[in-house]
Amino acid sequence: MTKLDPYFGEYGGMYVPQILMPALKQLETAFVEAQEDEAFKTEFNDLLKNYAGRPTALTLTRNLSPNPLVKIYLKREDLLHGGAHKTNQVLGQALLAKRMGKKEIIAETGAGQHGVATALACALLDLKCKVYMGAKDVERQSPNVFRMKLMGAEVIPVTSGSSTLKDACNEAMRDWSGSYDKAHYLLGTAAGPHPFPTIVREFQRMIGAETKKQILEREGRLPDAVIACVGGGSNAIGMFADFIDEESVKLIGVEPAGLGIDTPMHGAPLKHGKTGIFFGMKAPLMQDREGQIEESYSISAGLDFPSVGPQHAHLAATGRATYESATDDEALEAFQLLARSEGIIPALESAHALAYAVKMAKAATQETILVVNLSGRGDKDIFTVADILEERERSQTGQQKEESGND
């Protein structure tokens, strides 16, 4: 028996080998006790305030909105120490690990942001740190790999499968099954087996709680919609959690449409997946006709995940949240637009949410307040974007030469 409900409607659960059940139950017990312990909460809040830099700003954009009727606010998780929302829940889980007497942390990472956050928390709290990362992601996120190593983490490239986030998740889980007596698996998103989706949501919910307080101070009312990108779904559930009971506020998650939803090159399981079992949970999954897990794709490594957290699946099924998608090209355009119009370089992940917000703003016919969760900063993505833009410029120049040669 679990102390907390392991399901969100039909989604969630604990689909893990029997060997991991004691570890998950120990984690759940520690979490429930910590939530009732004032000393734990005080230490966590102190770290968030005096180490990570909370509360983060809620910034009203000056030039981003294409429509005078629409105000677009950004919740500035990019300003958090570590550069993304990941730091919030990592500090919470690292404190939990210490509470359980663990000496070592195992983690997985895609874009490297969760790895960096884990490495900084381990350095701060004197824990050994091991990070599994898909070999492809190691290549495309070299600045973050160096950051992790600089802070004392061991980064292990994963070459199995598609060499991306899902394979890193599998390897991390495999390692944990043989070492949970001394190690804690610090999962990086609101997915996986219970109690991880609940733990991650609770350690991220200050995003929405702060946003609610800040927007009421600024506008005297709640926003019409809050918008966040969705890979596994931790930044989005952190933003949504405090608004779920506010029926007037639309909750909008934006999945990566990659090269297009009508192609196999996307990462949008909520809209285009089938329910299956993966990574210890029942959730929407990108699967082929044989039920095998398909490779997901996104320009942003942090959204390149073939499934999604169970609470998002439940929010979609009940209609409380809607899930849209943005293509690579739309995210790239939004990435450049925010940089040019506001002097803020967003993570490519966050740019998916921005792209959809701008689209919503264009279509609005009445006064509207939108809040976008700017989940991370884009330093890690500048080389990826530069390469793509240079390549496009070259092919455009080549095309123009070809056309002028045909005149």
UniProtKB/Swiss-Prot annotation:
Transmembrane segments: none annotated. Pfam families: PALP. One of its GO terms (cellular component) is cytoplasm. It comes from the Bacteria. Disulfide bonds: none annotated. CDD domains: Trp-synth_B. The keyword NADP does not apply. One of its GO terms (molecular function) is tryptophan synthase activity. InterPro entries: Trp_synth_b_CS, Trp_synth_beta, Trp_synth_beta/beta-like, TrpB-like_PALP, TrpB-like_PALP_sf. It catalyses: (1S,2R)-1-C-(indol-3-yl)glycerol 3-phosphate + L-serine = D-glyceraldehyde 3-phosphate + L-tryptophan + H2O. Pathway: Amino-acid biosynthesis; L-tryptophan biosynthesis; L-tryptophan from chorismate: step 5/5. The keyword Amino-acid biosynthesis applies. Belongs to the TrpB family. NCBIfam families: trpB (TIGR00263). Tetramer of two alpha and two beta chains. This is Tryptophan synthase beta chain. The gene is trpB.
